Swiss-Prot record:
It comes from the Bacteria. Belongs to the SNF2/RAD54 helicase family. RapA subfamily. Its EC number is 3.6.4.-. Residues 162-332 form the Helicase ATP-binding domain. It is an enzyme of class 3 (hydrolase). Residues 443-597 form the Helicase C-terminal domain. ATP binds at residues 175-182. Interacts with the RNAP. Has a higher affinity for the core RNAP than for the holoenzyme. Its ATPase activity is stimulated by binding to RNAP. GO terms for molecular function: ATP binding; DNA binding; helicase activity; hydrolase activity, acting on acid anhydrides. Keywords: Activator, ATP-binding, DNA-binding, Helicase, Hydrolase, Nucleotide-binding, Transcription, Transcription regulation. This is RNA polymerase-associated protein RapA. The gene is rapA. One of its GO terms (biological process) is regulation of DNA-templated transcription.
Length: 923
């Protein structure tokens, strides 16, 4: 059928878009606007997956003005349809097709049944189960949290859930090293992407961390970012195209933007929804002279709605630098440094009261006064009485209520998340082994002997350069046939993947991984617990980064750290300074770089010449370093903000969230569904044992391509622990693109839309007709409203007997399906033709019955949306009165969302999605 502007068409692959209208045409493409979803699609005219919508005489037509009427006649003029319709006021009016409502209930299942496109009964079952799973996943509070390739760390899950659910979050992530700020940022981002709150993301990082972020986003979150640099952008300059508009997920370096102001202008014009800045503490600021890098990020942060800053802890930064970060997030709130300092002091006495509440101590009069001053709008006297009572349950409830109220009103608690190792339990110990050798050349012999003594252990060796790592691999292979993998920054991501997989293989893998000091950035090897520092890192931050490859949450054993050095060498003195001065091998040292800077001149002498300092002078350096470190440590402990820690780690709620995901990990539901999905689609499965399978495409699949399935096949696992150890495997969860897109493939396609089956039942007369009808209740609304959390596509199942009675509640789906037998396609087609009149009558009956089942679902969704959005608005309005960190713009957006959401839910409708005709026989 030829296209014409103004015609109405339906997308066969995206029914939820509603009824579209052609807005533009050329020889090769057709452009269609879908008003219900406010989306535009461009299709190749020759192969457009579209269905022309033509209504017939006698059908009901819905006008975009909201009224409905019966069609009396249809006329075609130059390819456009004009309908003569009787209005509710009994008037005959002509309706052009462009005026038809974009929200349409369209039953393709019936068309497929009567046009001999009948599927197998098992395909119908897959479709119904898929629809049920789709609904459950949209409603799940774990959506966007469970799919990360990472251990279930409560504080990370808490931050991801808390920040990810906000509208346009602007926060500072300031956890200590090793607590997973990158993972937190990725989980927040994934949560926002899943909820369709953001679509376009810009990540700005130091140049050396670009590949680390690229790897982390892909391996942990299945997010495909693009690296941008000058060479890539130059390709678009000739076409006068803004390069930042060519991709949705972009990573670039801060240094590149600094040196190319024109690229900053292009980034500002690219309408990003979310900005993430790593190492934000390097953005130098003072009131009189902010740095160029700071001003650059400030420009972007002003116009991009969501901002995540990853930074060192406030204690490491100092107050002024910490204020500068907060100023990027909310310049109106944090406008003056001295005002900020005074406000912070106001909260210090409250921290002491929090300590008493946490320790179940009685509150002093002074502590009560401080709490009352901060909670002026709340009558806290009943809570104080409950705390002083003898009722343990009342005491606990009152303490928790007070703590929560204080957290909500904390000066920066809503914007700042900072966890410390002291506040987060579960870390292993670090055990330092100093290996003193006679000569520098003895290192290789020592390493070979060490590897031979620990043949059953995985050993991670860090060298200064890639060249050293490559040389060592050759020596180990040629001299002792020791299996070693090499890992360095000159390798491609795929090559590093292979090396990591070779090292991770517990049966036939490498015993040792030889890595350059920066080659392993972004990679974690918790399955190994032995670290050899063949060359010492040149500063404390690099040292912590190297140890952090093994010493992370999730490490099950104590980390053994071996440092081989020649006696009287610069390296052994540097090792002693790290150990005796900083205690940096066996503990994290937040003040390490500050001490490194303070003693930089002396350390330069140590590194360049082992005799530049006498033994007495070196001993004095160790003593001074230790003294300053202890002093700084005491100051840091005094400044501990328990209120902030409580807000950051999530407490019992965070643990409950982790437990929920663990329970889902252990459930067989996903495994059963995925294997059935692969089986019916025609994906080949090869069981590898050890909780993993290889899936490969075949020439007999029901679809041309299965999402995420490579031609050479993919190894997948449903086991979180195995996925952490084997990065080359895909970790399948309900959030994985392969599962989500597999669900979409079935739900939005034609698989199982119309089926027929035989029920052998001696108690029913032969030829008895039953029909199973699956309707979908849904809202065709703009994605940004995220109405799927209130009303996801919801299946309603009817099972009608030959008299039109719904017996679905008496006969469960799985019970019925297990008793059905397949019918040959020719027989099925003949029976449909013979019973067409009865089938049509039963479908009409189903259309009448479903209304009473669908309307309560829509009403419940409206009530849920009203309650949830109103509660959040009321909470934020109450908090804004006492905590200026609540932005009025955030409340305004929520109020707009509430009004628009209720309006869209009122327009929700239902449609027949699929059906199964069942015929009985005695045998």
């Amino acid at each position: 059928m030829p296209f014409a502007i103004g015609q109405r068409w339906l997308s066969e692959s995206e029914n939820a878009l509603g009824l579209g209208v052609i807005t533009a045409l050329d020889q090769r493409t057709v452009t269609i606007y879908f008003p219900a979803a406010d989306e535009t699609r461009i299709y190749a005219a020759a192969q457009a997956p579209l269905s022309r919508i033509v209504f017939s005489k006698g059908e009901t037509l819905s006008h975009q003005a909201g009224w409905q009427g019966e069609i009396l006649d249809v006329q075609n003029m130059n390819g456009l349809l004009f309908y003569l319709v009787k209005t509710p006021q009994d008037e005959d009016v002509i309706v052009q097709e462009r005026d038809i409502s974009p929200i349409i209930s369209f039953s393709q299942a019936k068309d497929r049944l009567f046009s001999a496109q009948i599927d197998r009964s098992s395909h119908f079952a897959l479709r119904y189960r898929t629809l049920c799973h789709q609904q459950a996943q949209f409603k799940s509070p774990l959506r966007g949290l469970r799919g990360t390739r990472a251990g279930l760390i409560p504080h990370q899950l808490h931050i991801a859930a808390e920040v990810g659910n906000r509208v346009n979050p602007r926060v500072l992530l300031a956890d200590e090293v090793g607590l997973g700020k990158t993972i937190e940022a990725g989980m927040i981002l994934q949560n926002q992407l899943f909820a369709e709150k953001v679509q376009r993301v810009l990540i700005i990082v130091p140049e050396t961390l670009q590949h680390q972020w690229l790897v982390e986003m892909l391996r942990r979150f299945n997010l495909h970012f693009s690296l941008f640099d000058e060479e890539r952008c130059n390709d678009f300059d000739l076409d006068a195209v803004n390069p930042f508009m060519t991709e949705s997920l972009i990573i670039c370096s801060l240094n590149w933007l600094e040196t190319h102001p024109n690229r900053v202008e292009q980034a500002l014009d690219a309408q990003f929804d979310c900005l993430i800045v790593d190492e934000a503490h390097h953005l130098v600021w003072s009131e009189s002279a902010p740095s160029a890098a700071y001003l650059l990020v400030e420009q972007l942060a002003r116009i991009i709605p969501s901002v995540l800053l990853l930074t060192a802890t406030p204690e490491q930064l100092g107050q002024e630098s910490h204020f500068a970060r907060l100023r990027l997030l909310d310049p109106e709130r944090f406008f003056d440094y001295q005002t900020f300092v005074k406000e912070q002091k106001r909260y210090q006495p409250v921290v002491n009261a929090i300590e008493s509440l946490l320790a179940n101590k009685a509150l002093s009069a002074v502590e009560k006064n401080h709490i009352s001053d901060l909670l002026l709008e709340q009558d806290v006297e009943p809570l104080f009485k409950a705390i002083a009572s003898n009722n343990d349950e009342e005491q606990h409830r009152a303490r928790q209520e007070l703590i929560q109220a204080l957290i909500d009103r904390h000066g920066t608690g809503r914007m700042l998340f900072r966890n410390t190792r002291q506040g987060v339990k579960g870390f292993p110990h670090r055990v330092y082994h100093q290996i003193t050798l006679s000569e520098e050349n003895d290192k290789i012999d020592w390493l070979i002997n060490f590897l031979k003594l620990h043949r059953d252990e995985k050993i991670f060796v860090i060298c200064q350069t890639a060249a050293t790592a490559i040389q060592l691999e050759q020596i180990l292979r040629e001299r002792e046939a020791i299996r070693a993998a090499v890992f360095h920054e000159k390798m491609s991501i795929i090559e590093r993947d292979r090396a990591a997989a070779y090292f991770a293989d517990l049966e036939n893998g490498a015993q040792v991984l030889l890595s350059s000091s920066i080659g392993s950035e972004g990679r974690n090897f918790q399955f190994a617990a032995n670290l050899v520092l063949f060359d010492l890192p040149t500063n404390p931050d690099l040292l912590e980064q190297c140890i952090g490859r093994l010493d992370r949450i999730g490490q099950k054993r104590d980390v053994q750290i071996y440092v081989p050095c020649a006696k009287d060498s610069p390296q052994i003195r540097l090792a002693r300074w790290y150990n005796e001065g900083l205690n940096a091998f066996e503990q994290t040292c937040p003040m390490g770089m500050a001490l490194f800077s303070q003693f930089e001149d002396e350390l330069e002498k140590v590194r360049s010449n082992s005799t530049a300092l006498s033994e007495n002078e070196f001993s004095e350096l160790l003593k001074q370093t230790k003294t300053v470190r202890e002093k700084l440590k005491i100051e840091l402990e005094k400044g501990r903000d328990r209120l902030l820690e409580l807000n950051s780690n999530g407490g019992k709620q965070a643990q409950a969230l982790a437990d929920q995901i663990a329970d889902e990990d252990n459930s067989p539901e996903l495994v059963n569904f995925a294997l059935k999905l692969f089986d019916i689609i025609g994906v080949e499965q090869e069981d590898l044992g050890a909780n993993s399978i290889v899936i490969s495409p075949t020439g007999t699949m029901l679809v041309p391509d299965f999402p995420g399935l490579k031609e050479e096949g993919v190894t997948v696992t449903f086991d979180r622990e195995l996925a952490l150890a084997r990065e080359e495997m895909e970790f399948l969860t309900w959030d994985h693109p392969m599962i989500r897109q597999g669900i979409d493939l079935v739900a939005s396609g034609d698989i199982g839309k119309a089926a027929m089956a035989l029920l052998v039942n001696k108690q029913l007369p032969a030829g008895t007709l039953l029909i199973e009808l699956i309707y979908i209740v849904e809202s065709q609304s703009p994605k940004g409203l995220q109405l799927n959390r209130f009303l996801p596509p919801t299946p309603i199942r009817l099972l009608l007997d030959n008299k039109g009675n719904n017996i679905g509640e008496q006969v469960a789906f799985e019970t019925l399906h297990s008793k059905l037998k397949p019918l040959g396609k020719n027989i099925a087609n003949q029976m449909v033709k013979m019973a067409r009149g009865n089938i049509e009558a039963l479908i009409t009956r189903g259309d009448q019955l479903v209304k009473s089942l669908a309307e309560p679902i829509i009403t419940e969704a409206k009530n849920q949306a009203d309650q949830q959005l109103s509660a959040e608005i009321n909470r934020l309005q109450a908090l804004r009165a006492v905590n200026q960190n609540i932005r009025q713009s955030e409340i305004d957006i929520l109020e707009q969302q509430r009004t628009q959401s209720l309006d869209e839910l009122s327009k929700a409708n239902w449609r027949l999605d699929c059906l199964r005709v069942i015929v009985t026989n005695k045998e």
